[in-house]
Amino acid sequence: MPEINRPLSPHLSVYKWQVANTLSILHRATGVFMTLGSLAFAAWIVSAAIGPESYDRVLALLAGPLGLLVLFGWSFAFFYHLGNGIRHLVWDAGYGFDKHVARMSGWFTFIAAVLATVAFWVGVVA
């Protein structure tokens, strides 16, 4: 059999980067981030069970700038993953496969997640 000088799998340079690529990767990343955040949440709960000193240490860590940034990211991950999960359920029902509709629903999901995150944090701070 003659050797054919071509790639066995497509190269990334062949594909044009699209919103769908980014949203798919973001959906997976937010799922991983929420899982890791759940471990941090469990550590916070365990620290409360250990005693007040441990709880105060964890609370101080979460109330600091880095902790607030992580919590803000965790809440965005929650809202985005929730919205995109609903989007996938709509797809499972057989709707929204038109390219334009899929692109617009992706943007809607992302913008809604940003707005929900900001609204949540405005409610938390107020």
What do these predicted ranges mean?
Residues 1-126:
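Membrane-embedded alpha-helical bundles that constitute the cytochrome b-like, heme-associated redox core
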